């Protein structure tokens, strides 16, 4: 079977990591012929010398970042498809902005178009809201008209997306840690935090609006006032200039690492006490699984998407309340029994997620089913599966 893996739309964030993980596993899981379309950012992450002869890579010059770029992208991808004549196209994360002739499977991870009750919509400006609605129109149109089958990462998203796009087949394959977390020989120890006895909260993320990290200065102020003498620090994987509202008063409680590579992350978690994520919108943040994998507490927003993923393996707070967040942080740092319970629950919850290998196998099963049977139903793959059968 000839399969096009379309990663031309993957340019930022966790999509880069997930795509790299999937491609790495495909090297050993499948004998299909893979034609891989790469964005410039994705191409920089791929060591093509590691891939066998059934992989062919194409650097896609056009970008989906503008209307003109999307027109060029459609022409470029269509020309390649005519030459390759694939059986199936799998766009790892959409919207694809392109309708191939072959059967088309596409990943969906646009939480902002489904969780309309999110407090995210309370913190954005009118201009941002109008721009988001415009993007939503074009993005949903592409998912509806350019894709035959959609793939999401949680049951919650599957249910909401099937309501948004009735009649469209939607499959679910859970997100998971990159396979580098499974092999300590591949860990990098270049990012070393200053030695400290402070309770260390780690956030592995860019400073996107929906991550709600701008609340951190207010949380610092609350903790300093409410719990004098409590030693804590936030470790953030971006630059200090990107976090709004920071003054000299906040700096002793902040450490900025700058952008980190995936190989840096396991050792970075080892240097932290908890993973902190006050996010307002997610489909499935891989940070949850990473923290559980590294046996670290999860402190996150009390919102449905977070509870759907973490269940009883996280300490939840109101993400718009600095008091609620601060109290949760202090409780996590001082309640030893709570810590042990959360870590135990995290280890148990982690067993329910797929491994990187199982996730890739699940994607391949969907690709094969769509090619061989034209399967139109929807199903859910989250628990352990038989990757050989």
Model-derived features: where do they sit?
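Conserved donor-binding/catalytic core segment of Leloir-type glycosyltransferases
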Residues: 4, 192-211, 217-220
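Nucleotide-activated donor-binding/catalytic signature segment of Leloir-type glycosyltransferases, i.e.
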Residues: 55-56, 244-266
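Short alpha-helical donor nucleotide-sugar binding micro-motif in glycosyltransferases
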Residues: 77, 81, 267-272
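Membrane-proximal helix-turn-helix segments that form the acceptor-binding/catalytic region
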Residues: 128-150
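Aromatic "clamp/platform" in nucleotide-sugar-dependent glycosyltransferases that forms part
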Residues: 280
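Short hydrophobic beta-strand element within catalytic cores of glycosyltransferases
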Residues: 293-300
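Conserved acidic donor-binding segment of nucleotide-sugar-dependent glycosyltransferases
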Residues: 300, 315-323, 331-336
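A charged, aromatic-enriched C-terminal amphipathic alpha-helix characteristic of glycosyltransferases
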Residues: 337-379
């Amino acid at each position: 079977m000839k399969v096009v893996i379309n990663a031309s739309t993957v340019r930022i964030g966790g999509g880069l990591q997930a795509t790299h993980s999937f491609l790495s596993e495909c090297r050993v899981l499948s004998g299909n012929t893979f034609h891989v379309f790469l964005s410039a950012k994705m191409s920089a992450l791929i060591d093509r010398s590691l891939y066998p002869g059934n992989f062919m890579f194409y650097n896609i010059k056009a970008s989906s970042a503008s209307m003109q770029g999307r027109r060029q992208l459609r022409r470029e991808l269509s020309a390649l498809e005519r030459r390759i004549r694939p059986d199936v196209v799998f766009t790892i994360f959409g919207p694809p902005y392109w309708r191939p002739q072959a059967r088309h499977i596409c990943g969906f991870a646009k939480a902002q178009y489904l969780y309309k009750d999110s407090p995210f919509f309370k913190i954005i400006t009118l201009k941002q809201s109008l721009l988001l609605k415009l993007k939503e129109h074009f993005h949903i149109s592409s998912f509806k008209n350019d894709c035959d089958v959609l793939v999401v990462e949680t049951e919650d998203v599957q249910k909401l997306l099937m309501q948004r796009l009735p009649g469209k087949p939607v499959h679910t394959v859970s997100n998971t840690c990159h396979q580098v977390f499974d092999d300590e020989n591949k860990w990098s120890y270049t990012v070393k935090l200053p030695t400290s006895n402070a309770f260390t909260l780690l956030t592995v993320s860019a400073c996107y609006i929906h991550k709600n990290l701008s609340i951190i200065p207010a949380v610092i102020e609350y903790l300093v006032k409410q719990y004098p003498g409590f030693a804590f620090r936030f470790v953030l994987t971006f630059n200090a200039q990107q976090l709004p509202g920071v003054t000299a008063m906040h700096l002793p409680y902040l450490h900025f690492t700058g952008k980190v590579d995936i190989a840096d992350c396991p050792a970075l978690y080892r240097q932290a006490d908890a993973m902190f994520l006050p996010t307002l919108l997610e489909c499935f943040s891989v940070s949850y699984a990473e923290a559980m994998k590294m046996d670290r507490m999860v402190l996150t927003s009390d919102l449905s998407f977070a509870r759907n993923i973490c269940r009883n393996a996280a300490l939840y707070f109101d993400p718009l309340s600095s008091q609620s967040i601060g109290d949760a942080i202090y409780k996590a740092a001082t309640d030893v029994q709570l810590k042990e319970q959360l870590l135990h629950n995290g280890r148990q919850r982690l067993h329910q997620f797929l491994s990187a290998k199982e996730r890739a196998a699940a994607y391949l099963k969907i690709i094969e089913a769509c090619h061989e049977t034209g399967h139109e139903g929807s199903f859910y793959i989250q628990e352990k599966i038989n990757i050989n059968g």
